[in-house]
């Protein structure tokens, strides 16, 4: 790899984490993309100050030859544009070659949505298991209920602390992308599941002072992978097919809009920086309406 670019990439990543407050996963993604460029530039660039648009385009073309999806190309080029903009602002580049680096637009697929009937079957199944009193089953029911009730991300539910919960107002304080905090409400089924979990949470504890809300069998904060596996297993037999926690997020948003929720309220609930990101769910709702019309109307 190009040693100078690697060094700058690490400095850039540190800035993203400390000054911009990006999450570890986001920083890791940016760093990976810049290191990809560093590998390409090795032997092609003597001094970093000579980096130009031609080299960036050549790198992006090489990435495309790996049969990368448009969404991957879009993400990688966005990472490099951020990197070169930072280098320019730091005086490391006289001009910003990444400013004119264009990438194919990521094709947007309509997100999967789990049918309400399928969800109700899962909720009933989880409630039956939780009624055994087994702490893991009680916890798992709460996880699924809260993910659907709030539409929060898997990283956000795993990051919750006990003090994140306000039972008096039925809300949770969530730390989202960019360390932005938002308040998200939840309904009575999730509240019931939460209270049942809080009653057995102490059985997971191995030491005092643990602040994490969701705990594993060792008394530590439950990891993202464990939640992903739980949700994936529960959704595996539904018509939706292979899916994970993000599908529950999509489903919650779509069901809210189906029920007449305001688009901006849903944007705030999900923690989207852009309204355009939330608008994808309006397309899902229209598609569902069209499909329902086609199946139900005698002259469809």
For the regions a protein language model found, what residue spans apply to each?
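Conserved catalytic core of the tyrosine transesterase superfamily
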Residues: 1-300
């Amino acid at each position: 790899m190009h040693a100078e670019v690697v060094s700058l990439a690490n400095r850039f990543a540190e800035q993203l984490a400390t000054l911009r407050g990006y999450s570890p996963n986001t920083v890791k993604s940016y760093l990976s993309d810049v290191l990809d460029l560093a590998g390409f530039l090795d032997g092609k660039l003597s001094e970093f100050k000579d980096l130009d648009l031609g080299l960036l385009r050549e790198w992006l073309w090489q990435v495309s030859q790996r049969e990368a999806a448009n969404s991957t190309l879009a993400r990688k080029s966005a990472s490099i544009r951020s990197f070169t903009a930072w280098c320019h602002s730091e005086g490391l580049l006289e001009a910003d070659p990444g400013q004119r680096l264009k990438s194919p637009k990521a094709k947007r697929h309509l997100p999967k949505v789990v049918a309400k009937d399928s969800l109700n079957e899962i909720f009933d199944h989880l409630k039956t298991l939780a009624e055994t009193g087994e702490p893991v089953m009680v916890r798992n029911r709460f996880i699924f209920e809260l993910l659907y009730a709030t539409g929060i991300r898997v990283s956000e539910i795993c990051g919750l602390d006990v003090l994140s919960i306000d039972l008096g107002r039925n809300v949770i304080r969530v730390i989202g992308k960019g360390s932005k905090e938002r308040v998200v409400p939840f309904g009575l089924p999730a509240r019931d599941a939460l209270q049942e979990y809080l009653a057995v949470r102490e059985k997971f504890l191995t030491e005092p002072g643990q602040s994490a809300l969701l705990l594993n069998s060792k008394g530590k904060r439950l990891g993202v992978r464990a939640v992903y596996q739980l949700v994936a297993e529960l959704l595996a037999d539904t018509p939706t097919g292979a899916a994970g926690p993000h599908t529950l997020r999509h489903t919650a948003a779509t069901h809210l809009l189906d029920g007449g929720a305001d688009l901006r309220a849903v944007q705030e609930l999900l923690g989207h920086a852009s309204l355009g990101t939330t608008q994808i769910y309006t397309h899902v709702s229209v598609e569902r309406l069209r499909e329902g019309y086609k199946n139900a109307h005698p002259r469809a």
